[in-house]
Design a protein with these regions (language model features):
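Asp-based, Mg2+/Mn2+-dependent phosphohydrolase catalytic module
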Residues: 68, 79, 83-182
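N-terminal helical cap/lid subdomain that shapes the substrate entry/recognition surface
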Residues: 1-64, 72, 83
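Glycine-centered short loops/turns at secondary-structure junctions
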Residues: 73-74, 152
Length: 182
């Protein structure tokens, strides 16, 4: 093992995670091998990596309510800045999300671009054959929301106020988007 500080310095601060998210290591095996090489740690199995990743995640239950509702109103998809290992581990990390999304999962490593850059949104829209005006993005990052808006998508920033994510506002935004006149 290694301390979180060592991992942060060797992997994240030096830009390796961003490179992985952009597709430089396009398989979980390649990602995990490079992670071990760069951080000078033993190579983790995908299950070990997923366990560590799960411990670092924060579940936002109210967002699941909004995702379920959105799936009743139209097609839903995930668009995430993450490497191949996360994509492969998603059924372990968030099986309820996978159940709702089905195959509608796009990760930055697949698209060769990262949020908030405009290109990732264009590639995601093209992948689904959807006009930007007919697409809605929810994200907790203002930069990602602005990136989506810059290509013509409707976007909502999920805010945290007094330690609580404003998921009621997210659900309302989903309903408002679905009810818009076409």
């Amino acid at each position: 093992g290694a301390s979180q500080y060592h991992l942060a310095r060797t992997w994240w601060a030096d830009g390796y995670e961003a490179r992985a998210e952009a597709g430089e290591w396009p398989t979980p095996a390649a990602y995990l091998a490079e992670f071990a090489r760069v951080t000078e740690t033993r190579r983790l199995s995908l299950a070990e990596w997923a366990s560590a990743r799960a411990a670092a995640m924060t579940r936002i239950d109210g967002s699941m309510v909004a995702l379920r509702r959105a799936s009743e109103l139209g097609v839903v998809s995930l668009l995430s800045n993450n490497p191949a290992a996360t994509a492969s581990a998603l059924p372990i990390l968030a099986p309820d999300v996978v159940e709702i999304l089905g195959r509608n999962q796009l990760f930055s490593y697949m698209l060769g671009a990262r949020k908030p850059g405009e290109e990732i949104y264009r590639r995601a829209l093209a992948h689904y054959g959807v006009d930007a005006a007919d697409a809605f993005l929810a994200d907790d990052s203002l930069a990602n929301v602005e990136g989506a808006r810059s290509v013509g998508m409707t976007a909502f920033q999920l805010l945290r106020v007094d330690g609580q994510f404003q998921t009621d506002a997210l659900l309302a935004a989903v309903e408002t988007f679905a009810a818009r006149s076409r």
